[in-house]
Amino acid sequence: MTSSERTGFGPYLALTRLLCPLVPLALRWRLRKGKEMPGRWREKLGEASVSRPDGPLIWMHAVGLGEALALRALVAALEARRPELNILVTTGTRGSAEALAKNGIGGAIHQFLPMDCPKARAQFLDHWHPDFAVWSEQDIWPGLVHAAAERGIPQVWINARMNRAARDRRMRQARLYRAVYGCFQTISAQDDDTTRQIAAFGVTAQVDGSLKPAAQPLADNAQERDALTAAIGERRVWLAASSHPQDEAVALDALTHLAAPGLLVIAPRYPQRGDEIVADARARGLRVAQRSSGERPDAQTQVYVADTLGEMGLWYRLAEAALIGGTNDDIEGHNPWEAAALDCAILHGPRVANFATDYAVLDAGGAARQVMDGAALAAALDDPLLSCQTGRASVLVQRGRDLVDALASQLLTRMDA
């Protein structure tokens, strides 16, 4: 690390030293609120809950649920090439830990990322002493990057994503982020726009595309799927996936336009909204069953509110098509590739800024379709050509898996250098 890079980190490191005494208090408050896992919250203080295995170890970090699930294909590709390699995956959220426990992440170890303060950083790196570090997407902690660089640990940034607004925010601390990005041996970006934004910090990125198309299929319970299939009968099933209120309004409106409504499954992004969704659907005169109450759909059920966690793999397998949530309001979209991986046709509203490149690729390839309102959603669901979308999406998924295979080879070459 150059002297100018060390200088760039200075103010940030000083601030983390000052704030460090507050970290345990903040974590205990979050624990009381149910935002931390009772048996594992001290991992965020750098206290490992499992032993480090012998042998070389790659440390990979992704902040949340979607980002962590996107790493599963890369972990599988690395393990296929180097079975003896140990992989540590860190995340920051309780939801991501629960999703990885439900869906698996190969033979990798999961831990929570330590808070970015001196003692936690040191304890984490002392215990795990990784041979190589991989940062994914946007959650990059300057103090940890600095600490790893000081120990001579090679670091790369993959699946990098940065729009102009994010660049402008970071430019307010330009010296810090020039130092951070200068510590990476390689920066692998999702798209050309990201490379342009990163270039403003004096570093170069290569375009390899997004990891999300290669995401492994979400898990489900085959026995439960069979039971639900028997309960539903021959009716078609369609889904409002990871939905928010405006998505649900569009989906419920579509029921009045469909030639054969079938069964609408609403799987809200936040399951605690289940009672609210049930009340709204019943106010429209619809017959509703609620999963969190132990109810199953029957031949008369029009709406099934799937207000539970960790079952999206089940709903995507049951449904022939999904309206992806967050695409009808200022949420600006959720990940469409989970549906693609399970041959569920993708429909979405106009608000997709969080996954703009992904939806553009899917739409251009005839693998997804934009719908503006309930009538348009119903027309898409009634279109006999809707099923053609899944085959086109499968082609794009395979391209993503080829990308991941190439990236895994690049990372191992970097690690061995």
Language-model region placement:
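Active-site and donor-binding regions of nucleotide-sugar-utilizing enzymes
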Residues: 24-222, 244-245, 258, 269-270
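C-terminal alpha-helical cap of glycosyltransferases
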Residues: 399-417
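Conserved catalytic-core segment of nucleotide-activated headgroup transferases in glycan assembly
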Residues: 66-81, 219-294
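Nucleotide-activated donor-binding/catalytic signature segment of Leloir-type glycosyltransferases, i.e.
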Residues: 100, 104-112, 278-307
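Short hydrophobic helices that act as membrane-entry/anchoring signals
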Residues: 5-31, 178
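Acidic donor-binding loop of glycosyltransferase active sites
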Residues: 128-132, 301-331
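Catalytic binding pocket for nucleotide-activated donors in carbohydrate/polymer assembly enzymes
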Residues: 200, 317-390, 394-396
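Structural alpha-helical scaffold elements that stabilize or flank donor/cofactor-binding regions
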Residues: 124-126, 180, 231, 315, ...
